[in-house]
């Protein structure tokens, strides 16, 4: 079966926004919801929907995750558990996709989508079902989504002199893994832990 191309930014283009959002989350004490752990970048919305980007070497990566409401694809044990036909998310995929997908496909963490980046293009297995990726709300995907979610997550930050504008959020994303505590304070104010936020951003360095 021929793989299907997926129109998504390359991992390097996702890095800045992902790191910036992780910095915001860590600064307010929500670091588990968005973080980097070695080669794995994680995001979840706190409601059971999640996405991980796993770097597997040679410029390649696997993006996988699940939306518990909108993923109509049932992979591996999920098919038997829910009594649904299985969607083979690895059909036609090279072997390097398999380890992160199989490791994540547990009864505690169903996998609804799995995309592979070969260094130039994202791909997925052929299927017609909604895999739930669009509903996960990954803030790293584009500027508008990142700004909206970053603004929502900082809306109740105490002691800010002014509400940050789009340029302030964009500056965080442009800095990415090099976010400084001072730059982060322009968005989150003086009370949240900007040092922890900057440390979280640094973990997105490869």
Report residues per predicted region.
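Short, solvent-exposed aromatic-acidic interface loops
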Residues: 65-73
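Short hydrophobic-aromatic micro-motifs
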Residues: 53, 61-63
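N-terminal domain-onset segments
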Residues: 1-48, 55-58, 73-206
